[in-house]
Regions:
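C-terminal domain-tail junction helix/linker
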Residues: 191-195, 217-268
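Two-metal-ion RNase H-like nuclease active-site motif
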Residues: 110-119
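Basic, flexible linker segments flanking DNA-binding modules
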Residues: 9-107, 204, 260-266
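K/E-rich alpha-helical interaction surfaces of small helical-bundle regulatory domains
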Residues: 1-18, 37-39, 237-255
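RNase H-like two-metal-ion nuclease catalytic core shared by retroviral integrases
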Residues: 86, 90, 175-177, 183-184, ...
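Active-site beta-loop-alpha junctions of metal-dependent nucleic acid enzymes
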Residues: 121, 125, 143-167
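Short glycine-rich loop/turn motifs
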Residues: 125-131
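Mobile genetic element proteins and their domesticated derivatives, centered on retroelements
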Residues: 1-4, 11, 31, 47, ...
């Protein structure tokens, strides 16, 4: 219907609405920026928390509605990726499972998780990511990207972890039964660092669920969203993501806190 065919009252009502300033203009701009800064992974709940932190007075439903108007929706990139299997049987020390899937640590640096995952690169090589995360805060404490999941990568992981652990802590560190975690070098080093090793049951990834969850997020939220040509680019992508994850990515399970905020509040 042409505007000239509308009833006079309807015509002027529409004209007035069109010329009226958008009261949500600032909030819309904030939503778009927050969505972009989150690698387009934040849904309306997280964006609502961020908006409230920034001083906007709005409801979750308002954010949901505005995201719809702006055409913003989360896309999960869950393409199949090959899993890295480091289990080669009993080749050294197999530690007891001290956690039994009780992932309820509240204090940072009491329980840590570690593992290695692999990523296929455009140049047909593989990149291997070794990480250590904190169970309580979900902070990524250490992450090492290498072209091989060998003892060298393991040593670099432990060297970096040693620099970042506070003095006088004696955390449990849980891993799978991968060959590298059974070695005499690993066992001796973690004990010297005051770490108590714990291991999953053979072939049970659920025993190390927090670590599996992080690697899943890393791949869905970042790595799987773009072709990564080589190891150098993978290192850059992982470094940027981990910095954002620790300092900026809020968790709905942690009352809207980032891992660093959680650790800071726990230490206060």
């Amino acid at each position: 219907m042409l505007l000239t065919q509308l009833p006079r009252a309807t015509f002027y009502d529409r004209l007035q609405r069109k010329n009226k300033p958008d009261k949500y203009a600032a909030l819309k701009a904030f939503i778009k920026k927050t969505f972009r800064d989150s690698y387009e992974t934040y849904g309306y709940r997280r964006i609502h928390i961020m908006a409230r932190k920034a001083g906007f007075k709005c409801s979750p439903n308002t954010v949901l509605r505005l995201m719809g108007q702006l055409g913003l929706s989360v896309t999960l990139y869950s393409r199949h990726t090959s899993s890295y299997h480091s289990y080669k049987g009993k080749v050294g020390t197999v530690n007891d499972n001290l956690l039994h899937q009780r992932f309820d640590a509240q204090e940072p640096f009491t329980v840590l998780h570690t593992d290695v995952t692999q990523v296929k690169l455009v140049d047909h090589s593989w990149g291997y990511i070794s990480a250590v995360i904190d169970e309580a805060s979900r902070e990524v404490i250490t992450i090492i990207v290498s072209n091989s999941a060998n003892k060298g990568q393991l040593h670099l992981t432990l060297d970096d972890l040693a620099k970042k652990l506070p003095a006088n802590v004696t955390p449990i560190m849980h891993s799978d039964q991968g060959w590298q975690y059974q070695t005499r070098e690993y066992q001796s080093r973690v004990h010297a660092m005051g770490i108590v090793p714990s291991m999953s049951r053979k072939g049970n990834c659920h025993d190390n669920a927090p670590m599996e969850s992080f690697f899943n997020l890393l791949k869905r939220e970042r790595i799987n969203r773009q072709p990564i040509k080589d190891l150098s680019e993978l290192k850059q992508v992982v470094t940027h993501y981990v910095t954002w994850f620790n300092h900026d990515r809020i968790s709905l399970n942690k009352n809207g806190l980032t891992p660093i905020e959680y650790r800071t509040q726990a230490a206060a």
